[in-house]
């Protein structure tokens, strides 16, 4: 772990405990894991308390008013305005991507991403870059030709 990796504070939001545990095991050697949550209300409270640099955010999370990840993002801005959000979801539907990007997520990757690519994506959004999973990027490139 280098010094830049250690200083990046990460929070993980996903309603599947086993998935969160796997992500934490993958990221813990590289980053400071400061919190985790499984629903809208718990996520907003955790983000307000821990003020992470980056939140890995599932799109479909129970609770709140039914807005899932987009709702968490919008409600958390007031408490942690400098936090960057990277959506990490099993879904790659345009509706899901659009909802969190419109809400302010810096990127969107699918859960098929490798551990190394996830680490790289976190560093990139932390540095201010937008990140999208290779499948979404390829679809955009093809659509513009």
Predicted regions and their residues:
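Non-catalytic signal-transmission and effector/linker regions of two-component phosphorelay proteins
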Residues: 1-9
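Conserved active-site segment of CheY-like receiver
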Residues: 15, 88-92, 111-113
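Two-component/phosphorelay signaling modules centered on CheY-like receiver
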Residues: 17-35
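Two-component signal transduction core modules
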Residues: 36, 55, 85, 108-109
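Acidic, metal-coordinating helix/loop segments flanking the phosphotransfer/catalytic sites
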Residues: 38-54
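Active-site residues of response regulator receiver
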Residues: 58-60, 89
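Short amphipathic alpha-helix used as the core "switch/output" element in two-component signaling
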Residues: 67-82
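Short, flexible helix-to-coil linker/hinge segments that flank and couple to helix-turn-helix
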Residues: 95-102, 107-144
């Amino acid at each position: 772990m280098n010094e830049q990796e250690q200083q990046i504070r990460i929070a993980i939001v996903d309603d599947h405990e086993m998935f969160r545990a796997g992500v934490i095991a993958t990221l813990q050697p590289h980053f400071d894991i400061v919190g985790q949550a499984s629903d809208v209300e718990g996520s907003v409270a955790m983000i307000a308390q821990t003020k992470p640099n980056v939140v890995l955010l599932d799109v479909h999370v129970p609770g709140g008013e039914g807005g899932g990840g987009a709702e968490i993002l919008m409600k958390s801005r007031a408490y942690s305005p400098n936090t960057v959000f990277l959506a990490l979801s099993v879904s790659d539907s345009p509706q899901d991507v659009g909802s969190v990007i419109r809400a302010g997520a810096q990127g969107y990757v699918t859960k098929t991403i490798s551990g190394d690519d996830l680490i790289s994506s976190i560093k990139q959004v932390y540095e201010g870059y937008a990140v999208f999973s290779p499948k979404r990027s390829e679809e955009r490139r093809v659509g513009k030709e």
